Amino acid sequence: MVWSVKYLRKTGHRFLWITSPVRFSQKRAGDSNGPISIYVAICDHFEPFWGNVYQEIAEHRVATWCREFSRASREHTDFLGNHPKHTFFYSEQDYNPLLLDSLQKLCRDGYGDVELLLTHHDDTVQHFRHRIEEIRDVLFFHHGLLRKDNNGNIIYGFIHGHWALNNSRPDGRKCGVNNEIPLLKQSGCYADFTYPSAPDITQPRIINSIYFAADTPGIPCAHQRGYAAERECWSDNDLLLIQGPLSLNWKNGYLGLLPTIENGGL
């Protein structure tokens, strides 16, 4: 028991989301009278040069992904005959034309999709806008990735590196820009897929939800507040956040006294 108290004192900030009643997605599958469509999303923080490996290792990683996933995907279809697709949130700092061309072929064959992952630190509004617009345009015009909406604008899904969306770390590291919501919206971001991040300190109090967040000028962590997304309801100004699952796992707890966190990580 003494050990448990010490553990809570040291790591209690990681569990603040547990006390939050904010869960917008309350509707259960049994509430529907019609057919139910189930969507499974795998949001891969794809960094082929992870661990500062050489080009040859990064090429091997991408080649293996393309070969093995397409082989596995061909064996499965949904009721419409579509094969599973893997979504690569490609790291902007790992940009490499050869690797992206390999992923483009996988996407063209119907087995994948590419979105954006951006990591930055101590950044400015101008520099962040330049980076996100530059990688967006390069992926679309040079590699045939991403897509356009009905108005002809390039759109993309987004994951923030180190989960520090809207400068959400208390120490201000791993970001530096308080108002990322309007910058993302203006550059074509249709949704953010960053969370959950627990047990990291960046975890929002809103959990297990699909919701919109409005910007709060000059104030960080605007996505800590929001309103539920609804069918046939869209916002041109507020950012859509699509969260993965987050809950407590009592079956694999610490010494049978404290739960672990289930955050959907693979």
Q: What are the roles of these predicted feature ranges?
A:
Residues 103-143:
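Substrate-binding cleft of extracellular glycoside hydrolase catalytic domains
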Residues 56-74, 99-100, 128-142, 173-183, ...:
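Well-ordered, non-membrane alpha-helical segments in soluble/globular domains
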Residues 1-112, 120, 154-163, 182, ...:
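Active-site beta->alpha N-cap acidic-glycine motif
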Residues 80-83, 125-135, 196-202:
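Noncatalytic linker/hinge segments flanking ATPase motor cores
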Residues 78-81, 140, 144:
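Residue-level recognition of short, structured coil/turn motifs
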Residues 96-100, 126, 168, 204-205:
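Short, solvent-exposed polar/charged micro-motifs at secondary-structure junctions
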Residues 48-50, 94-98, 123, 199-202, ...:
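Flexible loop/turn segments at secondary-structure boundaries
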Residues 2-28, 144-266:
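Active-site-adjacent pocket scaffolds in enzyme catalytic domains
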